Curated annotation (Swiss-Prot):
Source organism superkingdom: Viruses
Identification of the protein by name: Uncharacterized protein FPV236
Ranges of residues in domain KilA-N: 26-127
Keywords linked to the UniProt accession: Early protein
Length: 280
């Protein structure tokens, strides 16, 4: 996957664009828009293979550069206890790959692309300031996946509500069209059977009643559609308001744990679609 189309569009980023998720007790991930980094919890090493794949590059090509060889030799000489590169083989594809120290990462990401380098730099700065230096953040990371799941439930609730209402209004509409078809068929049969050479006041009255019923049913179909669109519009508006309110909570400046509690409470008590019960 490459980012040629994305580079042509500059999107304003804010802190809410950064998503932190715990993969397991050994790995976590951080994502900014369309760039994601997988990080080892124990030492902060980053999966460089996945980042190279974003631009269709191979980390081995970087390692073959003369300047890269000199850099790697220097890093190994200065830090004999730790290799700046770790190869991880795991059953989960997301975890597989070569991991590099944060020091080495700063040298590699500009080679990948300016686009990736910019976003990774933002993510790693956020990691160093808000994750690695915050002893509570490890718990926050574990809870963040639960939080993301809960927030996604909002979409599920609203989607399910819209689907249920759509099905119900479809049933009502089908009933109306069934009645309309009956009257239209009756009218067509009377037109075919009518003897236009004779005065037929009774038949004319019957035709008028049929036309009135057809007009009434068509009006009910139109009203049914109007009410459906009104209810769906209201639900979508409320959904958007819930998202805005959750964003405000996330930007409140509270601790991450407090934000989690507030969002969970909001989801449980407030984020519910107000659906009209009398749309029969």
């Amino acid at each position: 996957m490459k980012f040629k189309e994305v580079r042509n569009t500059i999107k304003k980023m804010n802190i809410t664009d950064i998503k932190i998720c715990g993969i397991n007790e050994y790995f976590m991930s951080m994502k900014l828009l369309d760039v994601e980094v997988v990080i080892m919890r124990s030492n902060g090493f980053v999966n460089i293979t996945r980042l190279c794949n974003l631009e269709g590059k191979d980390f081995n090509d970087w390692k073959q550069l003369e300047s890269s060889r000199r850099l790697l030799n220097t890093l190994k000489d200065n830090n004999k206890l730790h290799d700046p590169i770790i190869n991880i083989r795991h059953t989960r594809i997301k975890i597989n790959g070569e991991y590099v120290s944060q020091l080495l990462l700063d040298y590699v990401i500009p080679w990948i692309s300016p686009y990736v380098a910019t976003r990774v730099s933002i993510l790693m700065r956020y990691y160093r300031r808000c994750v690695a230096l915050n002893i509570e953040t490890e718990k926050d990371i574990d809870h963040s996946q639960e939080l993301q799941n809960q927030i996604s439930k909002i979409d599920e609730v609203y989607d399910r509500s819209i689907k249920d209402i759509s099905n119900r209004f479809k049933e009502i509409e089908t009933s109306y069209y069934s009645k309309l078809s009956t009257y239209l068929l009756t009218k067509a049969e009377r037109v075919l059977e009518k003897d236009y050479s004779m005065e037929q006041d009774i038949d004319n009255n019957e035709d008028i009643r049929t036309d009135e019923m057809i007009a009434a049913i068509e009006a009910e179909i139109e009203e049914n559609n109007r009410r459906y669109l009104s209810i769906i519009s209201g639900i979508r508006k409320q959904h958007a308001e819930d998202r805005i309110n959750i964003s405000k909570i996330m930007l409140s400046g509270d601790s991450f744990n407090e934000i989690i509690v507030k969002i969970r409470d909001y989801i449980e008590t407030t984020a519910k679609p107000a659906v009209a019960n009398n749309y029969e």
